Amino acid sequence: MALTTAEQEYLRSQPLGRLATVGTDGVVQVNPVGFHVRADGSFVIGGLDLARTRKYRNVARTGRAALVVDDLVSRDPWMVRGIEVRGRAEVATTESPAYPGASPDVIVLHSDTVFTWGVEPGAGGMTRRDQAS
């Protein structure tokens, strides 16, 4: 799913997100991860020895994941902003790891649903967009 200009700019300003996957026992696992967004709106998640991690195995098994990227803009007044992406996920290999020493193994998240709050100028509350079927 294509991201808006405001969403792209926001994501470029944030170094970390939290990836949620579901384990074999049905329990949700959430981990901080580095990411970058491709031109097509998919998210590439990398790391050290990624193929050895539970999140990688969870994605390989279920083909689903969610990523939240958010921050606290101000405490007074209270202002938060963020993006949650839910969708299809796959394990893959890249020829150009995200940073020196990173594994060539990656998780690619293709968004089916995007929630945003505080990112789009003038949009109050949370907004939701779903991939057209």
Regions found by a protein language model. Give the residues of each.
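Residues located in well-ordered beta-strands
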Residues: 18, 86-88, 110
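Short beta-strand segments
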Residues: 15-49
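Structural motif
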Residues: 41-42, 64, 88, 113
